[in-house]
């Protein structure tokens, strides 16, 4: 029978060979404003090297580094965070090529109120070819940003060079940092295991069971990885989070003749405490039941955060629905019913999703409603990391209003 759970390639590789890639998908490092020290700039180079060599995506947060041209009081002048971003780009270019599928990613983050923010945003892509750039912000920081910064940021988003990340804090008020794909929030040196409910492999009555079983399996694995043995990552005893998410939603909806629009309405009714009607209502209720059950499991394991909707393309390609079609990534409708994956490692492979609703048929509003209502459901568990949410550039206008609505 098709598995209800889709493991990440990292987890499966680790199970098959614990000496190779580690099972954690992502990690973060907050760089202190010092060359030396356990969390200084030099330490960050070793940390990024370790993450890449063992298969994790690494987010490097640079906001604590002094701006370019400032002096440290000892006669030394700072070169600024952008100069160090170039080193991480070179590390990624070199190390990701040296091993079997150790193709981790690096994203450099900086807060919108850093003095070097415009330099960070406008650095030509050719100078930072092997990293992504992300700007961290919240309502207050956005409102305080000057017009030059806002204009540069909007242009960077439009051109595809800049990602946005919401500034978040944990339940104790301590800041947690966005990972590479922006769906997981971690303390510095923290890591996260990811796993997904294969919605396409579920009948409606399987959904809640899949949520609970998948979360329990993931939480049980969390204590067994030993990822802290190198001294680079936090130990599982104190680093308390996992990321359980979804893929193949479009397949599940197709198999039950439910449209995205119908499912969004049913989710909204469920969140409002109104029993949904028809098959869509039954499915929405099953999602609610499953999410609550999975949250109870995560609390049993004392997890601080436990849900994350990740960009699951590679994992979805290995996942099948009940009719044998490839499962679609995460919860969004696909652009087309088949996709060609052109990989330097595996060559060109074609995957067929079956007769699912595609993005042009669903429409932005219907998809966003499904995303918003699912996020509302997950948020109210108190255990949500986030969703690696992609806007649709052909229907969305990137302007200040876009940023404000996103915030």
Walk through the language-model features, giving the residues of each.
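Long, C-terminal-biased catalytic regions of enzyme "large/alpha" subunits
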Residues: 1-407
């Amino acid at each position: 029978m098709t598995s209800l759970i889709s493991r990440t390639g990292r987890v499966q590789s680790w199970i098959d060979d614990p000496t190779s890639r580690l099972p954690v998908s992502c990690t973060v490092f907050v760089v202190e404003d010092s060359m030396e020290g356990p969390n200084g700039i030099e330490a960050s180079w070793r940390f990024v090297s370790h993450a890449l060599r063992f298969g994790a995506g690494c987010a490097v947060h640079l906001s604590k580094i002094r701006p370019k041209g400032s002096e440290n009081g000892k006669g030394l002048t700072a070169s600024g965070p952008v100069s160090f971003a170039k080193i991480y780009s070179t590390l990624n270019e070199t190390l990701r090529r040296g091993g079997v599928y150790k193709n981790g990613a690096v994203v450099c983050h900086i807060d919108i109120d850093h003095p070097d923010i415009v330099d960070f945003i406008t650095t030509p892509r050719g100078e930072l070819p092997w990293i992504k750039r992300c700007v961290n912000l919240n309502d207050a920081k956005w409102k305080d940003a000057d017009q030059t910064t806002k204009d540069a940021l909007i242009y960077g988003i439009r051109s595809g060079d800049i990602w946005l990340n919401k500034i978040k804090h944990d339940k104790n008020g301590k800041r947690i940092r966005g990972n590479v794909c922006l769906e997981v929030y971690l303390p510095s040196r923290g890591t996260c295991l990811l796993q997904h409910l294969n919605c396409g492999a579920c009948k409606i009555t399987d959904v809640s069971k899949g949520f609970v079983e998948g979360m329990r399996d993931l939480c049980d694995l969390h204590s067994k990885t030993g990822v802290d043995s190198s001294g680079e990552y936090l130990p599982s005893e104190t680093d308390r989070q996992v990321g359980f998410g979804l893929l193949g939603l479009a397949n599940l909806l197709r198999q039950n003749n439910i449209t995205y629009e119908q499912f969004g309405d049913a989710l909204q009714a469920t969140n409002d405490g109104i029993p949904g009607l028809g098959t869509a209502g039954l499915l929405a209720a099953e999602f609610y039941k499953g999410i609550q059950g999975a949250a109870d499991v995560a609390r049993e394991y004392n997890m601080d955060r436990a849900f994350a909707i990740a960009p699951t393309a590679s994992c979805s390609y290995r996942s099948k629905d009940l009719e044998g079609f490839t499962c679609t990534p995460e919860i969004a409708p696909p652009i087309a019913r088949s996709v060609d994956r052109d990989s330097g490692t595996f060559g060109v492979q074609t995957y067929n999703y079956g007769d699912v609703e595609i993005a042009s048929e669903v429409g932005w509003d219907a998809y966003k409603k499904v995303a918003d209502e699912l996020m509302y459901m997950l948020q109210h568990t108190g255990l949500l990391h986030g969703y690696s949410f992609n806007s649709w550039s052909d229907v969305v206008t990137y302007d200040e209003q876009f940023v404000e609505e996103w915030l």
